[in-house]
Amino acid sequence: MNRGDLMEAFGVSVNQASTDLNRYVSVAPANIAYDKSARAYVRGPNFSPLFLTHDASRYLAQLRSVADGILDKADAWIGQLPEFDAAPTPVRGVDAKILRAVVAAIRRRESIEIKYQSLSRPEPRWRWIAPHAIGFDGFRWHTRAFCEIDQIFKDFVMSRIMETRGTRPRTSDPGSDVDWNEHVVLEIGPHPQLSETQQKVIALDYGMRAGKAKIKVRRAFLYYALNWSP
């Protein structure tokens, strides 16, 4: 890394790039060393992050966001992206107007009338819901809402909302949505019928300790968590 890299990445001047490099060297001298042959600063042998913690998931999430087209390469904080790709998944189309209307209803604490296509009915149906949150089950986006027809809190798949129209003040209290507000802890482990080697591999895959991993999940997401499979 040299001044030119900082100037390109952050759009700063030559003087500012020099100042930033010198400041970093002063606060973390063991993290960086100047390589005369490369005319650049390189990672020190005893490097230890000063401003960020070791978190592989953040790095990999950036790669996934770029692969999915959510994040432009120029906007990623990874300086040099490695060669990468991701297996495509079917697009779950959420209409921007629908999303905007639902989010507005959440912010304004309103009920909103939606035209919703459920799996249990052959034709879409207009209904009033009082959305208070948005959730993702790993594949689909939902809005968590009080259904004024069924008189219960439930999930509505965003891509199945075909239209919206009127709004009105909501009368339900999100605080009474027990399944959304309460969490449970799932304890998972390798299937006992797997071989010892296979169990060790599964434990590595999921970061298990002593053959177990604990996952905190909202009760509302319990069904999705239990039915998820890699």
Model regions and ranges:
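Polybasic (Lys/Arg-rich)
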Residues: 181-230
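Bulky hydrophobic/aromatic content
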Residues: 43-117, 228
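Conserved short hydrophobic interaction patches
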Residues: 24-27, 164, 228
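Core beta-strand-centered patch of the WYL/Sm-like small regulatory domain
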Residues: 81-193, 197
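A generic structural signal for beta-strand entry/edge sites
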Residues: 38-40, 140, 212
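Conserved aromatic-histidine-acidic binding/catalytic patches
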Residues: 8-9, 90, 213
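Short, basic/aromatic recognition patches that contact phosphate-bearing ligands
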Residues: 1-53, 188
